Amino acid sequence: MKAMLNPSKSDCITILSAASELPDGKLLSLDCRSLGLSRNGMDTAARFLIERACFKRYSEGDGHYAVGSLSLQGRLRLDQLANG
């Protein structure tokens, strides 16, 4: 049984906001220091958002994540988290 991911709202907003500025076809390598997040917080939020199809593309390897521009689901989730 998978553990439930419970990321912080602010960690999700930080990752979604960074990805929202990407042009299609580009990937953003997630780095906790440049995003101002803890490693654990960033990993939890990234997995949560990837599982919910918030990005058009993503890659994962050796404990590192890279995400592409936001999918429609990602844009809706960012709006929901930021405004609601």
Protein language model features and the residues they cover:
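Short amphipathic alpha-helical interaction segments
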Residues: N6, G36-R52, Y65
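Short amphipathic alpha-helical interface segments
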Residues: M4-L35
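Small side chains
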Residues: A19, A45-A46, G68, G74
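Short, amphipathic alpha-helical interaction segments positioned at domain boundaries
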Residues: S69-G84
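Non-catalytic, well-ordered alpha-helical scaffold segments
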Residues: K9-I13, D43, L72
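Minor-groove-contacting beta-hairpin "wing" of winged helix-turn-helix DNA-binding domains
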Residues: D62-L70
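A short beta-turn/loop motif at secondary-structure boundaries
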Residues: S34, G61-D62
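Beta-hairpin "wing" of winged helix-turn-helix
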Residues: C54-E60
